[in-house]
Amino acid sequence: MEKTFSLSRRDDGIALLTMDVPGETMNTLKAQFAPEITAILQEIKADSSIKGLVLISGKADSFVAGADISMLDACETAEDARLLSRQGHHVFAELEGLNIPVVAAIHGACLGGGLELALACHQRVCSDSSKTMLGVPEVQLGLLPGGGGTQRLPRLIGIAKALDLMLTGKQVRPKQAVKMGLVDDVVPESILLDTAIEMALAGKKTRKPLKQPLVTKLLEGTPVGRNIMFDQATKQVLKKTQGNYPSPLKIIDCVREGMAKGMEKGLEVEAAHFGALVATPESAALRSIFFATTEMKKETGAGDAKPRKVAKAVVLGGGLMGGGIASVTTTKAKVPVRVKDISDKGLSNALGYAYKLLDKGVKRRHMTSAERDKLMALMTTTTEYRGVKDADIVVEAVFEDLNLKHQMVRDIERECGEHTIFASNTSSLPITQIAAAASRPENVIGLHYFSPVEKMPLVEVIAHEKTSPETIATTVAFARKQGKTPIVVKDCAGFYVNRILALYMNEAAQLLLEGQAVDHLDKALVKFGFPVGPMTLLDEVGIDVGAKISPILEKELGERFKAPAAFDKLMADDRKGRKNGKGFYLYGKAAKKGKKVDESVYSLLGLTPATGKEAGEIAERCVVQMLNEAVRCLEEGIIASPRDGDIGAIFGIGFPPFLGGPFRYMDTLGAAKMVRLLEGYQSKYGDRFAPAALLKAMAAEGKTFY
């Protein structure tokens, strides 16, 4: 069997330990490496000619991307996972215990177990490359750093900074890493190895003392101060997670125990908590999301079809969506983009939008002003169809007006090449209707982004019956280059995400009209696990947008999509939400003292607000509507699989990740229970709760989606 670790000796007494996992593009730590690395460490101990050790990666742009998550699936019990953690502790303790200087030379991803490996070294130096990122993202998988990270990290950079890294899973760049003391030096990649060797030759085996301001020292250096910090961190975690995620609290406990009772006790607690977390349904759900997105990256969305190269893009419309799409095309995909708008105002808006986002990067020192200007130069503008002929893809982001979109299709077919893809960012109009104006319908596709474009990870790629496989594959590849997670969905009003969202929002509106207070509704769904409640979401998206989409969905999909008639009163009162400072909540000066409901909405709708219903019942009524419609979408072939439905709901509307998505959640509940819930509500509130035929069939046969 090919080895992962190789040891080479230099004449100056420095040994290089190179990690290079055979057949993989990135290094990941696996349990089966333990005997191999242990044997090498014994060899180093026995060789008195070795005066220092440098750890490097044999991969081009990856130090160690973390532990191989798939090995956790082999753990049948919490005890199996605890022992896996203890095995890692033993190996890292052996490395840390070497009586020669050990230096980690880091270039590329240094994450999770990779950073824990580096923390077990005596010193760390990293390259200044944009590809170098350091962090412990285990919390995002419902886990904690199980290789000693909860103990070594706070001792190296301080408790507050360590908790911030571990509780958020955020990754830091080289300059941030050296500033916080995570690494000892940052150098160009070309001299990384030489610098690491010099550090090893210098013979420093002890860590630099932690430099902290006096207030931080008082807090972190005394039991009373530490308890204040841990209690505050716990409060913040519970406020953010609503208690739905167990791992952040376990991370705090590991640090608390380790700082109070010493490193060895801390490691024992870390392993025990790691084992327990691996066995939780929350971690299983979060790991399933990780595996699903990893798997999706390998798919074209169109079988064996090969994507064409996109060397130039055009965006039609310089509004909020157009500006965002143009921005991610230049900054993420690094593809030149030409923005066309009928007005100079629209064009300056698109340029301003992109500049503002890039300038944030400069202010945060993620890039230089020269790098910002280079990316801005990729974006050009026009009010006429000039400089668009060589475009490989045109993304249309104009008003939801079918006649206008037909005009855009005809214009692009006239002005661009015969292979140019026309991708519509429509949120509700069926692509088949848009393609009706095309003489080359095989080039027409839907590419539905979510707002704000730079933040929302999902795009829906919508193929109509005549869309060619090559067009699908090219559009999917283009979306991935923009940093998006694309799901391919079948053409239908509302597609997938807006369709399941519409019924959820309609049910929330029904609850409001039954007298439930706006903030009571929102709190119930946030407690369930959504990032924001439905009324806040409607204010953010725009009440007018909802009012525009509802009739389209009702016409195409039936009575159950009919929006409550009382919403006409909101439109008559010009309530559009945050965009015009008038919605369910107060905005501007009236909202200075925190988020407050605009009480006038109750009198407008003829309501007396109450908080009579339990939060659980409110959430259940809204959520079962979403789940039931997701099943209908699967039944109709709108989505290709439960996996795509889960990813679409989590990344598109913030369905609680710890539940794994609508379909995994239904598997947890059981199809029979889902049918009982729906039929119970159907008898009370009518046929909008009628269970999907597929769900009833699954309940009868005891089947699951996965």
Swiss-Prot record:
Pathway: Lipid metabolism; fatty acid beta-oxidation. The lineage of its organism: Bacteria, Pseudomonadati, Pseudomonadota, Gammaproteobacteria, Alteromonadales. Pfam families: 3HCDH, 3HCDH_N, ECH_1. In the N-terminal section; belongs to the enoyl-CoA hydratase/isomerase family. In the central section; belongs to the 3-hydroxyacyl-CoA dehydrogenase family. GO terms for cellular component: cytoplasm. Its EC number is 4.2.1.17, 5.1.2.3, 1.1.1.35. Gene3D superfamilies: 1.10.1040.50, 2-enoyl-CoA Hydratase, Chain A, domain 1, NAD(P)-binding Rossmann-like Domain. The gene is fadJ. It is found in: Cytoplasm. Catalyzes the formation of a hydroxyacyl-CoA by addition of water on enoyl-CoA. Also exhibits 3-hydroxyacyl-CoA epimerase and 3-hydroxyacyl-CoA dehydrogenase activities. This is Fatty acid oxidation complex subunit alpha. It catalyses: a (3S)-3-hydroxyacyl-CoA = a (2E)-enoyl-CoA + H2O; a 4-saturated-(3S)-3-hydroxyacyl-CoA = a (3E)-enoyl-CoA + H2O; a (3S)-3-hydroxyacyl-CoA + NAD(+) = a 3-oxoacyl-CoA + NADH + H(+); (3S)-3-hydroxybutanoyl-CoA = (3R)-3-hydroxybutanoyl-CoA. Heterotetramer of two alpha chains (FadJ) and two beta chains (FadI). One of its GO terms (molecular function) is 3-hydroxybutyryl-CoA epimerase activity. Residues 1-188 are annotated as: Enoyl-CoA hydratase. The keyword Lipid metabolism applies. Keywords: Cytoplasm, Fatty acid metabolism, Isomerase, Lipid degradation, Lipid metabolism, Lyase, Multifunctional enzyme, NAD, Oxidoreductase. Residues 308-706 are annotated as: 3-hydroxyacyl-CoA dehydrogenase. The record marks E116, E138 as: Important for catalytic activity.
